[in-house]
């Protein structure tokens, strides 16, 4: 079964890999320069095809990969594919929250030197367990993780962390358009309902909320927005 899963994952990764030319170019460069030789990358991100291509790129640069996913989003065929490629991966689709925390701890126990985080779980763990001195840097994917770094962990993290969600490119490309479109498509597929003429309430008008509202309106939905921040509320009204 794991062989079948790995083959299914390989086909999905191959399809998305062919549509990610920037990472393909980076992977080719990394294969020659090996900038991550001797580094162990600990990751806690969604385990799906695009993430697999990212991990392949890091591995091509010499990194050892130790990874887990996020609760509820892990795709078993991608886990099987990554394991077949020699990476250490913890997690399964049906993991509950307790198992997810065990998986995160397993990544921390591997003593990674670079962290790719979502929600600041890895960063908080290495700081709380006195392991931060072995980490040279990391990234944080989300707004919630960025807020946690700036609030709960403010002044406690001795290594640099780049908050990917602060990038205007991510805000426009992923948050507004990718999230906006995929949320609306998921609504239609899960409910088997169409958007035109229906009333929707979008809670929050940040980049993701703007995208969801934009795609709902484009499909004929009637959209109301709930937003606490005055400028965002005014923007929604316009």
Question: Which residue stretches match the model-derived regions?
Answer:
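Anionic-ligand anchoring segments at beta-strand to alpha-helix junctions in alpha/beta enzyme folds, i.e.
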Residues: 43, 52-90, 235
């Amino acid at each position: 079964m794991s062989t079948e899963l790995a083959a299914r994952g390989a086909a999905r990764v191959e399809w998305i890999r062919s549509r990610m030319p920037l990472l393909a170019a980076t992977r080719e460069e990394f294969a020659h320069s090996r900038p991550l030789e001797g580094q162990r990358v600990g990751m806690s991100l969604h385990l799906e095809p695009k993430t697999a291509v990212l991990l392949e790129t890091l591995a091509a640069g010499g990194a050892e990969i130790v990874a887990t996913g996020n609760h509820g989003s892990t795709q078993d065929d991608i886990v099987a594919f990554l394991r077949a490629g020699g990476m250490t991966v913890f997690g399964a689709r049906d993991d509950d929250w307790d198992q997810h925390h065990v998986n995160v701890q397993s990544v921390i126990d591997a003593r990674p030197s670079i962290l790719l985080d979502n929600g600041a779980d890895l960063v908080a763990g290495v700081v709380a367990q006195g392991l931060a001195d072995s980490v040279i840097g990391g990234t944080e994917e989300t707004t919630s993780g960025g807020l946690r770094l700036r609030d709960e962990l403010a002044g406690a993290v001795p290594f640099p962390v780049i908050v990917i969600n602060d990038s205007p490119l991510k805000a426009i490309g992923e948050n507004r358009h990718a999230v906006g479109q995929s949320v609306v498509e998921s609504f239609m597929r899960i409910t088997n309902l169409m958007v035109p003429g229906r009333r929707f309430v979008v809670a929050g008008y940040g980049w993701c909320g703007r995208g969801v509202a934009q795609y709902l309106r484009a499909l004929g939905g009637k959209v109301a927005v709930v937003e606490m921040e005055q400028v965002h509320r005014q923007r929604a009204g316009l």
